Design a protein with these regions (language model features):
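N-terminal single-pass transmembrane signal-anchor helix
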Residues: 1-10
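Extracytoplasmic beta-strand-rich oligomerization domains located immediately C-terminal to a leader/signal peptide
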Residues: 10-109
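Structured surface patches comprising rigid loops and adjacent beta-strands/short helices at the edges
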Residues: 47, 119-135
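Short beta-strand segments
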Residues: 85-87, 120-122, 170-176
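A short, structured loop/turn motif at beta-sheet edges
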Residues: 90-98, 123-130, 166-167
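A short, surface-exposed interaction/processing loop segment used at functional sites
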Residues: 102, 107-112, 189-195
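Short aromatic-glycine motifs in intrinsically disordered, low-complexity regions
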Residues: 109-123
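Short linear sequence signals and composition-biased patches located at protein termini or domain-edge surfaces
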Residues: 129-198
Length: 198
């Protein structure tokens, strides 16, 4: 009986340690991913797209819906990609599951890319079951989260990133403030208006 009790206690301890290790790994992955997205998404260009001929067209270099976000920004210096870049945050198939990926490539001209075949791809989170993106303009009297950003006059000031993985379930929501890059501030350049503070 003593041997059985000791064996049961050891198994229980091992299971507890495994759960703690999993929780620590999840927290570390969340911290790293959140920090990286804050640094990349936190600086967005307000530059207008070239070739706009209709008031019905989106004048900004931005495409934002519930499953994909495309924007122009700059990669933090420590990652080595200099200059303004097109970025794309979305889900992509990697192996037998989906992953949250960030794709980026140099902005050679102010026109949204039609394809991403030549882009660099970084896998941020693997084994993702669901991704939902929402956008908000904090400068409005009653800001509301929107699954698709359709404004032709303003860029969103915040993005809410919600995702769930197969192993850990739903992550805590990540809210990132999207601030205009120096030189693309519409208040200084006479372009369309951003909401919120600069």
């Amino acid at each position: 009986l003593l041997v059985l009790a000791m064996g049961s206690a050891l198994r229980s301890t091992a299971q507890t340690e495994e759960r703690v290790d999993q929780r620590l790994a999840r927290n570390d992955e969340l911290r790293v991913t959140s920090s990286f997205l804050q640094s990349v998404l936190g600086r967005i260009s307000g530059q207008r797209a070239a070739g706009i001929t209709s008031v019905d067209e989106n004048p900004f270099l931005l495409r934002a819906d519930a499953k994909e976000l495309v924007w122009v920004g700059v990669m933090p210096a420590r990652y080595g990609a200099a200059g303004r870049q097109f970025f794309r945050l979305s889900l992509a198939n990697t192996g037998n599951s989906a992953s949250l990926v960030l794709q980026f490539m140099p902005m050679d001209e102010p026109v949204l890319p039609s394809g991403w075949e030549g882009a660099t791809t970084e896998v941020l989170v693997r084994d993702v079951m669901d991704l939902a993106l929402q956008y908000q303009d904090a400068g409005q009297d009653k800001p509301e989260w929107q699954s698709v950003w359709e404004s032709k006059e303003r860029l969103p000031t915040h993005v809410l990133i919600s995702l769930a993985t197969r192993s850990n379930g739903a992550w805590p929501p990540m809210v990132v403030a999207m601030r205009p890059l120096i030189g693309s501030d519409p208040f200084a350049a006479g372009m369309a208006t951003f909401g919120g503070s600069r």
